[in-house]
Amino acid sequence: MSEPFVLVLTVGLTHKLLPFAPRLQGLARLGWKRPLREVLPAVTCTAQATLLTGKTPHQHGVVANGWLFRETGEVRFWQQSNRLIQAEPIYQTAKRMAAERGGAFTCAKLFWWFNQGAAVDWSVTPKPHYGADGNKVFGIHGSPEGLAGSLESRLGTFPFHTFWGPSAGLPCTSWIARCATEVLREHRPDLTLVYLPHLDYDPQRFGVSGSDMGRLVRELDDACAPLLDQAAQSGARVWVVSEYGHVDVKRVCLPNRALRRAGLLAARPGPFGEVLDTFASRAFAGTHTPASIRRYLRTFLERFFAAQFKRSTLPDGPKVGSVSLSPRGDFRMPSDSQAIAWMEQID
């Protein structure tokens, strides 16, 4: 590939926020911009798998940020293995097609998910060290060997505490952008995938209306500056995409409480509080037949549309029905007081 391509994933960036990002808006003015339909569920792992493969969740198999591994009864989140994607990612497709034509294709994958074992030439990803005594030490993993250490020697230690947890914020995004700048300058991959998570923190902590979105977007735009400059110097095309946007919600959904009150979820008490017991939880049994699933869906749809009909007659009135989709986009599940009645009906 004579012209390198840089794909920057700026989760949370939407059309309405672009005016706060002059550099990124400049890309749109020079090129184009189009709406991107979100996947369901609109979560990181699912969205990234769709962007990498062009497939929907039922095709690539990444249906959430976490999986229940039935063999061990464990729920594991934020898995990094590229083998979890049950469809061919773009870098694998490009390498195969290039080889068929007698050419080569190189790719750098920087902080995108499903990085371990990916068929890429350069990768950097968050990967803590876990000790035999249960200790955890923050760190990053890179391929080829020595890449992560080389980048940290030039850029400083990756600020892992700002990538996950209560201190999550701008420093990690700035570091990743500078990391991508170094990789693009030094190796000039045909495809560089860069994940910049800055807009995924405050809107989830405080809500959109509780966050200074203008400031956050300007910070993201500033963090992109060295990468965009290097892309221009390298003659690379830049595309910017987003996983999903954020909206305010006014109600809370507590499915685990409803499942527990219905006797479908069990927990094990211990010194660190209660821990989910998947083996004792009928919600994880996975023994449903197509006939029973159809019966559950029929009951759900009957109650749902009945509730929606009632709502349509009282558009400005109180919420009616135990399950409904609000015109404002919120999702309402059965209340705690109604959960038992719901389960009795589908039984």
Report the location of each language-model feature:
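Glycine-/proline-rich flexible loop or hinge segments
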Residues: F5-T10, R29-R34, V43-A47, G66-Q79
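Metal-dependent active-site segment of extracytoplasmic phospho-/sulfohydrolases and closely related
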Residues: V6-L7, R23, R218-R260, L264, ...
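Structural motif
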Residues: L7-L9, L191-Y195, W239
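Short, structured active-site-proximal loop/turn typified by the sulfatase FGly-forming signature C/S-X-P-X-R
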Residues: H15-Q59, A108
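Active-site environment of divalent metal-dependent phosphoester hydrolases
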Residues: K16, D200-D202, V247-V252
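Short secondary-structure boundary/capping segments
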Residues: P22-R23, S123-K127, G207-S211, C253-R261
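His/Asp/Glu-rich, glycine-adjacent segments
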Residues: K55-G207, A283-A285, S292-D347
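Active-site-proximal segments of metal-dependent phosphoesterases and phosphodiesterases across multiple
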Residues: F206-D221
